[in-house]
Design a protein with these regions (language model features):
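Short, threonine-centered small-residue motifs that mark membrane-proximal processing/anchoring sites
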Residues: 2-27, 183-208
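Generic cytosolic/nucleocytoplasmic N-terminal low-complexity/intrinsically disordered segments
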Residues: 4-6, 110, 165, 213
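Residue-level detector of intrinsically disordered, flexible termini
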Residues: 17-24, 156-159, 215
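Short, surface-exposed polybasic-aromatic patches that bind anionic ligands, especially phosphate groups
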Residues: 26-189
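C-terminal membrane-anchoring or membrane-association module
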Residues: 208-218
Length: 218
């Protein structure tokens, strides 16, 4: 009987820990499904965002922003990646922690685009330009002055609070590096407030204590 009680309590505690750690890194399988009818805009030579991807075989496609201009994926290609909250994922990202400010700027640009504050074309090229000299020296990039967007958002990123990056997810391809392997992507996935996760975890731990006391009386 004691073994069963201990197993029950342990199970509840493990559930609470899993919930508390739900925002950590996870390994995923990604399959590129194209742009789903979206076309290049404003004279851009490339479509860019959105790259629609099936994650772990899901029939619901996820629209993602590419940050690696010099890498490529082909329609139907499948690869493994690590999905991590943006700030946490920078340490093991494609471009590394030396580019932390650039990743932060990319995250802010992406959120601004999602909020309707800039076009998808401008956001895509600005993010490409942060990480690739080939992108930032492209005639189209220069003609549209996307470098001014980068400069503005690098300044914003320098003082932005961590909460500004909430919900951003970095998808880093396994074994990928600049110019080699699949692209790295940034996505957005609303997550529960940290306080909510803490309350859920605390509640489950309290429940475990309650169960333990009830079992002790039986």
């Amino acid at each position: 009987m004691r073994v069963s009680r201990n197993k029950l309590i342990l199970s509840v505690l493990l559930i609470s820990l899993a919930l508390a750690g739900s925002a950590s890194a996870s390994s995923v399988t990604m399959t590129y499904q194209g742009h789903q009818g979206v076309v290049a805009k404003d004279g851009s030579p490339y479509i860019g965002y959105p790259y629609y991807v099936s994650i772990n075989g899901s029939a619901t496609l996820t629209p993602l922003m590419c940050d690696s201009y010099d890498n490529n994926v082909s329609l139907g290609q499948t690869w493994n990646a690590t999905a991590t909250p943006l700030l946490q994922g920078i340490a093991n990202s494609m471009f590394g922690p030396a580019m932390t400010l650039d990743y932060k700027a990319a995250g802010l640009i992406f959120k601004s685009m999602l909020g309707g504050q800039m076009s998808t074309t401008a956001a895509q090229w600005a993010i490409w330009g942060l990480f690739s000299a080939n992108a930032s020296s492209n005639a189209y990039f220069i003609s549209k002055n996307f470098g001014s967007i980068d400069a503005a958002y690098l300044t914003l990123a320098a003082t932005a609070s961590n909460s500004a990056f909430k919900g951003l997810v970095l998808y880093t391809p396994t074994g990928g590096r600049p110019g080699v392997g699949p692209q790295e992507f940034i996505g957005y996935s609303p997550v529960p407030e940290p306080g909510t996760l803490t309350m859920m975890g605390t509640g489950l731990i309290s429940l475990a204590g309650f169960i333990r006391r009830k079992l002790a009386r039986s």
